[in-house]
Swiss-Prot record:
This is Elongation factor P--(R)-beta-lysine ligase. ATP binds at R100, N101, E102, N109, E242, L243, G298. The gene is epmA. HAMAP family: EF_P_modif_A. Keywords: ATP-binding, Ligase, Nucleotide-binding.
């Protein structure tokens, strides 16, 4: 392709018009329900410790600074939004750009649009119902199916993910051609088997909310008080696409700091850079985060489904290859 051809957008104008309408409808959905729209920083002093996320960094320089300061492009507005919740914002939502220094492809672009919202005093199941309402409105689809992680894993893998010995997971992963399966930890094996055998086979005719992920995959979610083997975490899938990831949010600052430190220890073991813990976020938890359920949803993927697009580049004005 010549330089003269590279100026054109990756999406058609028709798709961009449809995108604008969908985003306007999303805003209306939340404002009519009384949520406050907020804006939070795209640049942060802190990266994220999650071993599954890679971040972009930049250098902030000024004539009045002795040396430059590293800043990170946010992978999610989560920490800043929770600081607003701790300050008394009430229910909030945000549509924003986020950045992940990872793959680009049919379903991925390093810069993408995230919808994130938080509902104080909601539990996980009540928030699942609200996500379902949004999907029905946006995609004109049937109501979502609800199923536990344990149920769908047993149905499609034939193994109980919460009690099976690791050798059984290794054997199944080998059957699915995972090289070096014997060297992987339990969570990596579970994630591989879930993405290989479960995700392609669920939510084909209508969305599905999978809830109660293993406690070891809790991230920033609470552990279930009824079954300590699982976390109060859910994900939505539809037609082979992971759409949303939500939690009953962890409010214990000490436990959150412990998880951050665990992440950094694992990063060190994997040869990944460690990240300074966001002490401002921990300060918000210490000050008091209300009991809250929150969820992040990939807007570009939602629009792909709404328009029947095969590639994320069809629904964003300029993908990474022509940005």
């Amino acid at each position: 392709m010549s330089l003269n051809e590279q100026w054109q957008p990756s999406a058609s104008i028709q798709n961009l018009l449809a995108r604008a309408k969908i985003i306007a409808d999303i805003r209306r959905f939340f404002t009519e329900r009384g949520l406050l729209e907020v804006e939070t920083p795209v640049l942060s002093e802190f990266g994220v410790t999650d071993v599954h996320l890679s971040t972009f960094s930049t250098a902030f320089t000024s004539p009045f600074m002795e040396k430059s300061k590293t800043l990170w492009l946010t992978t999610s507005p989560e920490y800043h939004m929770k600081r607003l919740l701790a300050a008394g914002s009430g229910a909030i939502f945000q549509l924003c750009k986020v950045f992940r220094n990872e793959e680009s492809g049919k379903k991925h672009n390093p810069e993408f649009t995230m919808l994130e919202w938080y509902r104080p005093h909601f539990d996980m199941h009540r928030l699942i119902n609200e996500v379902d309402d949004l999907l029905q409105q946006t995609l004109d689809c049937e109501p979502a199916e609800m199923a536990s992680y344990q149920f769908v894993f047993q149905e499609h893998v034939g193994i109980d993910p919460l009690s099976a010995p690791i050798n059984e997971l290794i054997e199944k992963a080998r059957e699915c051609h995972l090289d070096g399966a014997e060297n992987e930890d339990r969570d990596t094996l579970l994630q591989f088997l879930f993405s290989t055998l479960v995700e392609p086979n669920i939510g084909q005719n209508k969305p599905i909310a999978v809830y109660h992920f293993p406690a070891t995959q809790a991230a920033l979610a609470q552990i279930s008080s009824e079954d300590h083997r699982v976390a109060e975490r859910f994900e939505f899938y539809y037609k082979g696409i992971e759409l949303a990831n939500g939690f009953n949010e962890l409010t214990d600052a000490q436990e959150q700091e412990h998880r951050f430190n665990q992440d950094n220890r694992l990063r060190e073991q994997l040869g990944l850079p460690q990240h300074e813990i966001d002490h401002r976020f921990l300060g918000a938890l210490q000050a008091g985060l209300p009991n809250t359920a929150g969820v992040a949803l990939g807007v570009d993927r939602l629009i792909m489904l709404a328009l029947g697009a095969e590639n994320i580049s069809e629904v964003i004005s300029f993908n990474i290859d022509c940005a």
